[in-house]
Swiss-Prot record:
Region listing for Disordered, in residue ranges: 1-44
Any one Gene Ontology BP term: translation
Claim: Ribosomal protein is one of the keywords in the record: yes
InterPro entries to which the protein is assigned, alphabetical: Ribosomal_bL34, Ribosomal_bL34_CS
Protein name per UniProt: Large ribosomal subunit protein bL34
Record has Ribosomal protein as a keyword: yes
Organism in which the protein naturally occurs: Clostridium perfringens (strain 13 / Type A)
Composition bias, Basic residues: 7-44
MF GO annotations: structural constituent of ribosome
Source species, domain of life: Bacteria
Length: 44
C-alpha cells in the first residue's frame, strides 16, 4: 500500500479554488453558505 493523498497546490486550487466556485451557480451557493456560516477560509 502507498499513501493515496499526494497534495499538489495547483490541482487543489483548480478543483476546489475560488474561481472554480464562482463559475457555477451551485458553486456561488457554496460560497454564500460558507460566508453565512462565518468560515474564515471560503475555499481551498
Amino acid at each position: 500500500m502507498f499513501m493515496t493523498y499526494q497534495p499538489k497546490k495547483r490541482q487543489r486550487s483548480k478543483e476546489h479554488g475560488f474561481r472554480k466556485r464562482m463559475k457555477t451557480k451551485s458553486g456561488r451557493n457554496v460560497l454564500k453558505r460558507r460566508r453565512q456560516k462565518g468560515r474564515k477560509r471560503l475555499t481551498a
